[in-house]
Amino acid sequence: MWIKTTDRPSLTKVVLSHIANIRMRYYFIFSTIFFIAIISGVGGIYYGTTLMGSSYGSIFASFYRYFRPSLNIISHTIQGIRSSPDRLYIDMSHLDYEKLSHQVFNAKERGFITQDEKSVEVNASIRYNVEEHNVKVRLRGSFIEHVRDDKWSFRIKVKNGSTIDGMSRFSLSSPELRNHIHEWLFQRNLMYENLINLRYKFVQVYLNGKKLGIYALEEFFDKRLIENNNMREGLILRPDDLNEEGKPFLYQASKILKDSSKQAAYNKVIDRIDEYKRMKVPASTLYDVTKSAKYFAVATLYGGQHGHLKENYACYLNPVTNLLEPIGYDSNVSRVLSRYGGMIESPNN
């Protein structure tokens, strides 16, 4: 009986088959990488031209930050899961929640948040570190990303002369809107240089029992900010941002201007700002040049020139020197370093 044998492929055919498989594998890998690059490039253009400033802008920007390769991503993820940030509980009535929700709806319909919507304040209570405080709550921010989903940005004012962590006014925002840890680093650097800085930390926020996630808690302007920087109480103003009367914007103006001595100080600094703008006096008669130089150096290092826009650039009038000192605020650090020329990501540093 004959046993039929199958023809075995030659060694040459086996080698060629393996080469073909390797080529197909590399072709698939190359095609995948090329496809991802094209999608990322087109997506970047779409973000820059359409999404930036929309309710999806911060999500899209975060995609690029989250998916940048990092050898520490696993350890950082584990550390994040095991962390236990302070918890801050906000409670308000259903009616007050609906008042804010109505403002959010109007803002989303329009595409941005107006001053009218931000002027609607509601009563609430905050539980933090066992203590309970009565507060006023309103929306904050101008771009729609401040109210995307349920993670709204808030401005908090503590009532009855009370404070939370030493602050009577502060903001709560999604960390994405303050560029995650970058703003915290910026504020720490200002502290290191003995410049006026804000208290800044991360907390877990709950609203009426619902977990909203991690928020950036950022101190806002009032006398306690100045006291925390070991300075004497003084005016806080935006020298280049004019109010309806054509005068520099003054924080807490209705309260400050009731004090005759503070009103006199405000009028004097208005005159000096006007003289400086008309080039009648040098900058050294209006600004603390040494501290201003340090501040601008730090801001440039971090790419934080967004804080120099007239509506963001705030100064403290030191009653001892009678000079303006910059306050680091809303610097938008590290989001657009290439645009602002920030140095911390430069290949030469």
Predicted regions, residues:
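Phosphate/dinucleotide-binding and metal-coordinating scaffold of catalytic cores
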Residues: 2-3, 10-349
